[in-house]
Structure formats: C-alpha cells, structure tokens
Amino acid sequence: MAANYWESTQRKHWLFTKDELAAMRAKLEAEEPNLVASFPLPQLRHLNIYFNQQINRLGKRMGLRQQALATAQVYIKRFYTKVEIRRTNPHHVLVTALYLACKMEECPQHIRLMANEARGFWPTDFQSQTEVARIGECEFYLISEMSSHLIVHSPYRTLTSLQGELGLAQEDVNLAWSVINDHYMTDLPLLHPPHVIALTAILLALVLRQDPSGRLPGTAASASGLVAASAALAQAQAQAQARAAMMAGGGQTVPGLTPQSSSGLQAMLPPQSPAGEGPAEGNKNPRMAKVHRFAAWLSDSNIDIEAMVDCTQELISFYECHEQYNDKNTREQINRFVKARGLDK
C-alpha cells in the first residue's frame, strides 16, 4: 500500500461530492432507460447492505481478513459508478472484487478455491464449466473500469494509530471498528478521506459508550446517541464560525486554529468548573471526560468538522434505513434481472 494518502489515486480520482455521484448514477440510468424501467431495484443503500452481507458470508467461510473485505466493497462502489448494475451479474462482480482485493491486501486466494466457495452460495451463477473463466474475465473488467487504481486507504489504520494518543480503551476501539465496518454500506468511502471517517467513528464510539447498555449503533437505544453526536458537531461548527467572524472583525488571530478546528466541540462537553479544573463532573463521569479530551484534541488539529458532521448524518440516515432493509425482496429483485437477461449463464 502507498504510504501517502495525499498523493494517492484514491484522493485524486475517487473522491466525489454527493452531487457528482448523483449525476454519474443518473447518467448511467439515462443510457439504459428501458432496462431501468423493466427491472426496478431497491434503493442503493439496500443494495449496499446486501453486497456487504454476501461478502461477509463468503469472507467468513474462507477466513479472510477484514481489510480485504473492506477493499472489495470499495471496488464494487467504484465499479458501479462506471457501469449500470443491471448490465452485470452482481454475484460475479462481488466475488471477483473480493478475489482481486485479496491479491492487493496480501492474502491471495487461488481462483479455483474462490470459485468453488462462491458456487456453494450461488450454484446457478457459478457453474463448474465456466466459473474460473468468468472470474478471470470479470477481473479484467473491474481493473479496466477502475483505471487500474487498486490501492485503497482505509480508516482502520488511523483508528489503531490513534488508540494510544487518544487514550482509547479497547472497548472504544472495538465499537469504532464496528462503525467503520458499517460505513462501507454507505457512500462515505467515495465522499470523505479515511482519517475523517475514522475520527467520526471514534466520536460515535465515545458518545455511544456513555449508554451503559453498551448497545451497538443501529439499535433504537443508540439512535439518540447518534443524533446527539450530529447535533453536537453542528452546534460546534456554528460556534466556530461565529468565533472566527469575531476574531476576524477584531483583527485577532489564534495560532493553530481554523474556522473548522476552532470549534472545541464545546457543545458535547459537560460544564467547566469555575476554577478551570476541567469538566465539573469529570471525576463522576469518566466517559464524558474522555469525550472532553477528544474534543480538545480535535480543537488543536485542522480536522474538517463540516466533513465529520456530514459523516455523522450519513451514518444516522443509514442506520434508520437499515431498519427497513428486506433481504428477501432485495435478493429477488437482483435475481429477477440476472435470470431474465441470462447473466447467470
């Protein structure tokens, strides 16, 4: 993996705005209006959930590393910004993406083993006479559509590297890791840098762990925590902009602070004690003290708070959407166009 994200093809070629993504997808559908009309599909988030679940099933069966599963999902997202999904067999694409990701993440799998395992899940899509050739052909197709940009930087590295610096407990890291896993079912890998996603996951982990139940994101009990995190960041950003405007008007500057980093995230912190000794309830609530330390760390950095707000809101929206996911319906709609168009042959 390339050491420098800032010079990577991921940053230069595979980060988009939401409007750009929407325009690319609309263009693909406009090129195939009859196909789109004939085979309606679930919303994209539900398709991403389905792909995630299928890749995780196959990866678990084969004992693959999480990094390879994550990279495969990024490949699928990139590929489907270039190719209309109804022109492909998604099962071929996801198996091939995983096969290619294993190569890139230094845990290669033999193509015949991958084909045999895939046949166990999708016997009609992977017939013994053609399955290996099919994966080989699809591999070149993926590489071509991605312009050979195969190195993917993930948020996991940022999370593990900051564990000591931020004083994160292993439970914090585990929950943040789960949030990062979940973000691959959204468009966030195509919208924001991995370090922003990692820091958002840390924030959500710290906020959610204040719930003594320790529930993971996506449950009803955790929804309020996610909303609180989003509101805190939004309020902090507004405070930062107001403070920056006042400093600009008075000709004052504060070294190391930008409109994004000057927020201090005070909205999510407990009240300060009059003596300036830190959080008034710090000794009683160590979880809030940890949130305070993380906020102070962010205030001293140049992290884009607006991007963290967007990441948080996207995750909230995703968790709400996940509750309406219907696996049977999604699977049937995919199989319908695959069989009707003979893409399972």
From Swiss-Prot:
Region (Disordered): 256-285
Positions of the Cyclin N-terminal domain: 53-144
UniProt-listed Pfam families: Cyclin_N (PF00134)
GO biological process, one term: positive regulation of transcription by RNA polymerase II
Subcellular location: Nucleus
Keyword Cytoplasm: no
Highest taxon of source: Eukaryota
UniProt keyword Membrane present: no
GO annotations of cellular component type: mediator complex; nucleus
Keyword terms of this UniProt record: Activator, Cyclin, Nucleus, Repressor, Transcription, Transcription regulation
Protein family membership: Belongs to the cyclin family. Cyclin C subfamily.
Function: Component of the srb8-11 complex. The srb8-11 complex is a regulatory module of the Mediator complex which is itself involved in regulation of basal and activated RNA polymerase II-dependent transcription. The srb8-11 complex may be involved in the transcriptional repression of a subset of genes regulated by Mediator. It may inhibit the association of the Mediator complex with RNA polymerase II to form the holoenzyme complex. The srb8-11 complex phosphorylates the C-terminal domain (CTD) of the largest subunit of RNA polymerase II.
Protein name: RNA polymerase II holoenzyme cyclin-like subunit
Protein's organism: Neurospora crassa (strain ATCC 24698 / 74-OR23-1A / CBS 708.71 / DSM 1257 / FGSC 987)
Gene name, Swiss-Prot/TrEMBL: ssn8
